[in-house]
Amino acid sequence: MSAIMTKVLIIGAGHAGGSAAALLRQYGFEGEIVLAGQESAPPYQRPPLSKAWLKGEAGLEDLLLRPGFLYECEQAMGRIAAACRGITAVVGWPQAAGAVVYNAASVLRDGAVADTYRKRELPNYAVFDERRYFGVDPDGGPCVFDVAGVPVGLVICEDLWFPEPMADTARAGAELVVVPNASPYERGKHAQRDALLAERTRATGAAIAYLNVVGGQDALVFDGASVVADGDGTVHPAAVAFAEQWLVVEYAPDERRFMPRVWVDDGDESVDALAWRAVTRGVQDYCRKNGFGKVWVGLSGGIDSALVLAIAVDALGADNVTAVRLPSRYTSGLSNDLAAEQCAALGVKLETVAIEPAFEGFLAALGPMFAGTTPDLTEENLQSRCRGALLMALSNKFGGLLLTTGNKSEYAVGYATIYGDMCGGYAPLKDLYKTEVFALSKWRNTVGGAPVIPPAVIARPPSAELRENQKDQDSLPPYDVLDAILLRHVDQEQSREEIVAAGFAADTVDKVLKLVRVNEWKRHQAAPGPKVSRRAFGRERRYPITNGYRG
């Protein structure tokens, strides 16, 4: 332990942060310890399967409307405060004050609550609904407290995105500002955060310790990646993204800078690398926090299910994944072979259940009513629904979560069968367009030695194999065209006229936009999946099913 270190700031107040504080005391550190976190309860109050105790701005939802929940949070804060002796802790929590609830963070020391800051800026866009639950204290002001002679300020998450809260805190005397966050991952977020931190520190001269929640919460994945910023705007990456860790940093108050003990090298931060870490963490935490130790994947020999299998193995380990082939009269020998090849490469158990008996049973049962009709999409969907029913039966009988394999392109235009391949509890590819599925598959094959997805799977034309010689492009535009239109319409909210003006054929745009519109009902019934884009289906895009608008 450095002889010059008199105080320690631990970023994160979860199990790892608590363990870090205990270890410091165990090894004789007698200085000030600041434990800063967004968590609303101590580690021993957070059951491993309880989503209620993950303090995210979008995580608690209508639990915040329940008086009993708010009372338990208040009681937990009292227990934490009583235990805080010899350290200073900053803990986020929903503070009920009469009929109003505040998104608050309290400073705890000497067995009591020393001060409380109430969040000023409440996000009410995208995945955030804070104005539904929280109020703003009209009399609330800056929160500045002393830690070993250093005036430390406190603002919460969205407050940092507006200049006034940080400026007011600095004017109140803060030289170092702690910013607890529950900020979910999306592409480009790291660079955006770093630029914001540099801007705020340069404007105020105060250093910042920016800490973020780590882990999956249903459709959101919090990436952690906590950073510290010197008073001159220099940003230091301090924590690995998508991984929980305890972090100790040294701060030089006279210079308002953090001393470089060990700044983290987070390795590959490419678009694909971060997307992979987001979806694998999403799968891992959804399973762990909801009590699923194992998963099932219907493996077709196509790219979507192959990518889901690779994600599942990285998230949970091969021993906890079972793949199932469900061949039909239209399944090619190549599809069966590629599924077997991938399972052998990954060490995954492979089962085979033919759908032909179930399919024939449905056809026989419906035969009298279908007499005189021509086979069409109905019979194709029946095959998918046979697969969905069989996979759900395996999940029910033997336990484990069924992962769905649909991607964002399919969910957008309805090329996923309701009660068929949409069966399952979690959708790892839900926010990845088909072109991104290909890109992510190629990237993953470059990591860690031998390919985890057979190259032939990536090379072959996509097909649902629900009729003879079927290809996706028989009824859809090429995926590079389709996804470019969808990106503009879904993610960027561009109108038909704007998309056509960008050079896309009007008839193609009309077809795609109609498919998006008429398949809203399917998306309302889809399983959750990890958000990686700036505009994911679900909470961020809330469209009515019954809708006459055609723009």
Show the residue positions of the predicted features.
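Short, surface-exposed alpha-helical segments at coil->helix boundaries
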Residues: 47, 60-63, 74-77, 194, ...
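Beta1-alpha1 glycine-rich phosphate/pyrophosphate-binding loop at the start
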Residues: 4-63
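Residues at the starts of beta-strands that form the adenosine-phosphate
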Residues: 7, 30-32, 175, 320-322, ...
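Enzyme catalytic cores with a strong preference for nitrogen-chemistry domains
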Residues: 61-298, 309-318, 325, 350
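ATP/NTP-dependent adenylation/nucleotidyl-transfer catalytic domains that generate, transfer
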Residues: 66-68, 148, 205, 231, ...
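Short beta-strand "acidic-cap" motif of Rossmann-like dinucleotide-binding folds
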Residues: 30-37, 116, 323-325, 352
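Conserved G/P- and acidic residue-centered "switch" motifs that form tight phosphate/ATP-binding loops
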Residues: 14, 159, 302
